[in-house]
């Protein structure tokens, strides 16, 4: 049984940055460090940081006064940021810079008097943060749609002054169809020069298509609450290749491997490589050969830490 590894896979620059911010804050200031929401959607990562002294909370009212709080990579609403400022909390913002870019687009549309449509999944923290970045004091509204049916039912106040943005971790194919539906219904709709789906999401989706075409089974390493990991599993399945989303190697069921001669492995943008290697070891214990890494898009993007934290790290070294 062959093992084929997607390339690229696993951590993206935004996830790397967010995890580094928490780790460096723990190094410099010591525990506890409070983190609003899971810093990234991966159980292994969150548990590892919790063991170091990170305390994960869902809302700021769970945070005592005079502590350090880190905002997760998914971003937060203006209301959350303003509450933190009102309380005088010391904040390090681990919001992915590509999510921040969408926040700025939303605010710019609001200030122009344009209403905004956000394409995204209801309840996802990135969506909640982005919705909360639209400033309704300028007279407009922001609307959420997930699919073409939502677009068909969408009614807006100002169709001639309308724009759209997207969640960064969506399926490119699904999003393209929703954008087409928006443009068909609202021909004057404005949008970003380039869609908001991030480079890492695009690269991993391109890679899993190629991987699935060469595999009898695809395993996606990632947590169930990871949006981009779920999209990878869905994309593999759409090619006709069975696919499973697994958090750990222990979740692999031997019966999945019946009559499988080539198994593909990829990982969501929040899944560490150590989990991929554990999956490889588990498969090899079940008779698989050494893995073959497929060619793919090289990634060399990095994002820097917040300046204050960066300076404190340098001073402590």
Swiss-Prot record:
Residues binding dimethylallyl diphosphate, per UniProt: 41, 74, 124, 226-228, 270
Annotated isopentenyl diphosphate binding sites: 41, 74, 124, 226-228, 270
One MF term in the entry's GO annotations: 4 iron, 4 sulfur cluster binding
Pfam families associated with the record: LYTB (PF02401)
Coiled-coil parts of chain: none
Pathway participation: Isoprenoid biosynthesis; dimethylallyl diphosphate biosynthesis; dimethylallyl diphosphate from (2E)-4-hydroxy-3-methylbutenyl diphosphate: step 1/1; Isoprenoid biosynthesis; isopentenyl diphosphate biosynthesis via DXP pathway; isopentenyl diphosphate from 1-deoxy-D-xylulose 5-phosphate: step 6/6
Name of the protein described by the UniProt record: 4-hydroxy-3-methylbut-2-enyl diphosphate reductase
